[in-house]
Amino acid sequence: MTNNNMIFIANWKMNGEKSHISGINKTIKFLKQSKNKKNQIIYCPPFTLISSVKNKVKNTKIKVGAQNLSQLNDYGAFTGSVNSKLIKSAGGDYVIVGHSEIRNQENDIIINKKIHSALKEKLKVILCIGETYKEKKNNKTFSVLKRQITIGLKNIKKINNIIFAY
């Protein structure tokens, strides 16, 4: 049995302004005309645009996510940090965790804390896994992925709210 449902995740990175949100109209039109009603689209704009994008896609199947989050779930004096509560209150449905551009500054234990924080607030997680070029060249792919998944999912009881992105 094959699963023909696809999930398209648009990570805007550090791009986009409020004026760019109107471009989502093309996606909404495409979804309405699409024969496969099970495909899913998730937009992950910069934090500053999450609520605006969420407002734009209300009454559609399109979901909205954040590009990262703090491992800390509490409020406090953490300049520049965004926790899962703030993402949820802005309208986020998903959060990207462990993206390669950030993973090199974090370890698997921090990734695990972020996953726990996101799931606690009922956010779905897009867990990015993958090896570096050097690890691939040294035939370490399997061991790296195994480590990232094993430590990243430590004490996670259910993985049905986690999407793995490689």
Regions found by a protein language model. Give the residues of each.
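Active-site loop-to-helix "anion-binding N-cap" substructures in soluble metabolic enzymes
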Residues: 1-166
